[in-house]
């Protein structure tokens, strides 16, 4: 709607909220529940957005722009309402209208569940990218799955992680729009028959006896900041083609009557179903093909509505594959070009290899997906045939370039040893292969993907990840955002490089006091959250030392908690020890099937139970595990952190983006030289970070030469020995001495499939402990700490996702900006 004066804006918004309350709930605002109010306000805000949404797509069509389709299994969007209001620049108006109606916007925002469409850094990166694409005016679709329950809602019961369904759609999603007119069919299983085309004499490949589902899109608006551009996140839901078989029902076969419905329902139920068994693996592959096939089919239909030549696809469309999950895009695009448009192989391959680009997010072999050949060929018979042919031709290319070198063929083949290797397929077909931090890209080029880099170096490039300052400062830390704007103006909101203007204030005593006072207020806010949710009193004057991220052994939450155990032992030995009070804050979900990660969560909670209830240490250490870590509580946590724990084993973390969110909010990094930490240290200077541990090259060398024995450290260091012994002597598990035995064994014993202490926790322990001492020393010097904290915020300009997206748009996608 076209607003004129502020008064008219407010009047119209108020009327709309009241009208939606009537339409949706047959109630007045005064009678409404908080959830009903949230719904009515959301619909009223969506009203404003839809006009811009329509105008954006009209402008894209008129200008005939090239569009990027960002394909991702995850989009960790967080809550939509507050972010939308901020990006519309209507925060003041909305707050005033709601105040007049006796409604608090912040409380209203708490009624919105986080959209359960992702889990970790991969999904949050995708969400930041969508925010930047809209804010910069680049035409884009995010494409994913409309999960009914997300990954899971984490509950901590008796210290253990319990997975509960995250039923985020139970009250409906006011921002989504169902688009049944764009539904497409997706086929699984069956077999492929070859028929001669009577007209052309060519072979036609036909999939028969398959099962199929309808992929139905739901569109969510992604609002750019203050520019009226609204892009689309399109998430696909699966519906049965024949929802109910009355004939089977009448014959008493009730299962068969709803078989189609059940097939459809399972596809979109959860993110990352446990794949410790074959049924889980099959469901994951089904999910991947489902959303990829739907997205690619629809993108091509859209292209053909506006252009009648399929050969022009690469000039108008780019598919960006976010990690290996969407790699079936390559054979699916080939299938459509070969089987539906009748192209010859070489033409189809030329189009495909100019349309698909791949982002690698990991060097962890376990995460570079490999599918059992039997499963892949059974579930996706035509896709497998095409992949097989791509592999045959690719192997011929390798042999032509490296005659008589079977090792090269072996290491680079797409199908080998009964497995289909998705990363290899993405690299063979993609015109661009990018890593996500400079160190990560170098490791890919010279270690993990060395053979591919030698054969096709022109494909490889780096795009260091970034975060959106609009979510993680403007929305997540409004007090600091207002202070920054007061000091340097508001250009930083759309150009984070401008935040460097804060550098002139880092030695200013008054500015330091203001900055640290805001930090303290944010710590009070987090302390209140912890008291409400954990029942633990924490002192906002203590150092808030924070590690929040997915639970994985390489991220080394275990190193952190072992150090807490060590500190506790020191305090018990020397009760008078002068130690600055510390609050160690953890937040992490472990995959449902990842047993050891779940044991580490239990260990953190068991240590918390002992330490938090020991009056003799006078509150010098507190340990808190924040349940169900997600975007909405992350915003509160980042704003309050004093220390950012980024302690992955060097060479294992591709980039990390939590490190950037802490930096933006003024928390120095305690970390290894890994991922984007390297680039953060470059920006702030080594004196403004706490770096420890092996370098990535040292880790790689140890892994290759097998010369590390953690038992030597265990035998020589009595403090470490004492901490490890406590894992198995009942100190933290009196009811079950074997509860943490697996963790203990993993640090000291080599078994058939992993080395002892494969993530070098004991090797880095003393270096970590020394770095922690330096943190305490620095924190005691208030002026030094304030300056260090301010430098983090002032120097984070490089780490905006706006910068990252500009690089993708110019160097990979070749998109043009659109203004309204």
Which positions does each model-derived feature cover?
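A conserved ligand/cofactor-binding region detector
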Residues: 1-820
């Amino acid at each position: 709607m076209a607003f004129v004066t502020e008064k008219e804006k407010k009047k119209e918004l108020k009327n709309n909220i009241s009208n939606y309350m009537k339409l949706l709930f047959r109630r007045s605002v005064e009678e409404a529940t908080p959830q009903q109010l949230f719904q009515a306000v959301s619909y009223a805000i969506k009203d404003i957005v839809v006009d811009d949404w329509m105008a954006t797509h009209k402008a894209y069509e008129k200008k005939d722009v090239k569009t990027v389709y960002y394909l991702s299994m995850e989009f960790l969007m967080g809550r939509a309402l507050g972010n939308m209001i901020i990006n519309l620049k209507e925060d003041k108006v909305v707050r005033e209208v709601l105040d007049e109606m006796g409604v608090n916007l912040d409380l209203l925002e708490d009624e919105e569940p986080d959209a359960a469409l992702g889990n970790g850094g991969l999904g949050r990166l995708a969400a930041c990218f969508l925010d930047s694409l809209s804010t910069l005016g680049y035409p884009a679709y995010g494409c994913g799955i409309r999960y009914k329950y997300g990954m899971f809602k984490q509950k901590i019961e008796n210290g253990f992680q319990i997975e509960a369904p995250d039923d985020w759609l139970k009250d409906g999603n006011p921002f989504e729009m169902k688009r049944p007119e764009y539904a497409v069919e997706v086929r699984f299983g069956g077999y492929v028959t070859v028929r001669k085309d009577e007209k052309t004499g060519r072979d036609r490949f036909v999939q028969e006896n398959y099962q199929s589902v309808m992929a139905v899109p739901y569109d969510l608006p992604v609002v750019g900041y203050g520019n009226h551009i609204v892009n689309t996140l399109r998430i696909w839901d699966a519906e049965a083609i024949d929802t109910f078989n009355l004939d089977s029902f009448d014959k008493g076969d009730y299962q068969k009557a709803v078989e189609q419905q059940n097939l459809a329902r399972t596809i979109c139920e959860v993110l990352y179903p446990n794949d410790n068994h074959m049924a889980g693996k099959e469901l994951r592959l089904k999910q991947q093909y489902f959303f990829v096939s739907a997205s690619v089919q629809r993108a091509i239909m859209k292209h053909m509505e506006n252009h009648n030549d399929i050969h022009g696809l690469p000039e108008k469309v780019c598919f960006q594959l976010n990690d290996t999950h969407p790699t079936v895009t390559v054979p699916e695009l080939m299938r459509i070009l070969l089987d539906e448009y009748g192209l010859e192989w070489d033409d189809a391959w030329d189009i495909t290899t100019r349309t698909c680009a791949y982002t690698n997010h990991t060097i962890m072999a376990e995460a570079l997906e490999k599918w059992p050949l039997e499963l892949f060929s059974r579930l996706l018979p035509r896709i497998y045939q095409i992949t097989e042919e791509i592999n045959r031709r690719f192997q011929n290319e390798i042999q032509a370039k490296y005659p008589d070198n079977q090792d090269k063929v072996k290491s680079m083949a797409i199908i080998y040893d009964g497995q289909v290797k998705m990363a290899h397929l993405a690299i063979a077909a993609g015109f661009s292969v990018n890593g996500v931090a400079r160190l990560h890209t170098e490791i890919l080029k010279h270690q993990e993907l060395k053979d591919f880099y030698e054969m096709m170096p022109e494909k490889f490039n780096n795009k260091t990840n970034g975060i959106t300052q609009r979510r993680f400062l403007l929305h997540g830390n409004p007090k600091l955002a207002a202070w920054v704007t007061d000091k340097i103006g508001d250009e930083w909101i759309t150009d984070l490089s401008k935040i460097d203007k804060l550098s002139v204030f880092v030695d200013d005593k008054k500015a330091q006091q203001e900055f640290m006072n805001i930090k303290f207020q944010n710590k009070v806010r987090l302390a209140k959250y912890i008291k409400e949710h954990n029942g633990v009193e924490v002192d906002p004057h203590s150092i808030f030392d924070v590690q929040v991220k997915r639970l994985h052994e390489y991220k080394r939450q275990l190193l952190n908690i072992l150090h807490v155990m060590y500190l506790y032992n020191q305090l018990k030995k020397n009760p008078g020890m002068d130690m600055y009070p510390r609050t160690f804050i953890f937040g992490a979900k472990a995959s449902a099937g990842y047993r050891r990660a779940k044991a580490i969560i239990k260990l953190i909670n068991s240590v918390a139970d002992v330490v938090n209830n020991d009056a003799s240490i006078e509150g010098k250490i507190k340990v808190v595990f924040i349940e169900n870590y997600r975007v909405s509580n992350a915003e509160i946590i980042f704003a309050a952190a004093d220390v950012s724990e980024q302690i992955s084993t060097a060479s294992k973390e591709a980039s990390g983006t939590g490190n950037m969110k802490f930096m933006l909010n003024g928390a120095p990094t305690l970390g290894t030289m890994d991922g984007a930490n390297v680039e953060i240290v470059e920006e702030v200077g080594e004196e403004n970070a706490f770096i420890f541990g092996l370098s990535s090259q040292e880790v790689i060398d140890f892994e290759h030469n097998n010369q590390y024995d953690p038992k030597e450290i265990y035998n020589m260091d009595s403090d470490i020995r004492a901490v490890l012994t406590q894992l198995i002597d009942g100190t933290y598990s009196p009811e079950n001495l074997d509860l943490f035995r697996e963790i203990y064994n993993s640090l000291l014993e080599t078994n058939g499939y992993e080395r002892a202490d494969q993530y070098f926790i004991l090797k880095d322990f003393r270096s970590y402990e020394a770095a922690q001492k330096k943190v305490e020393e620095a924190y005691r010097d208030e002026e030094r700490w304030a300056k260090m904290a301010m430098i983090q915020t002032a120097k984070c300009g490089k780490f905006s996702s706006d910068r990252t997206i500009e690089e993708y748009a110019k160097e990979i996608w070749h998109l043009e900006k659109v203004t309204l």
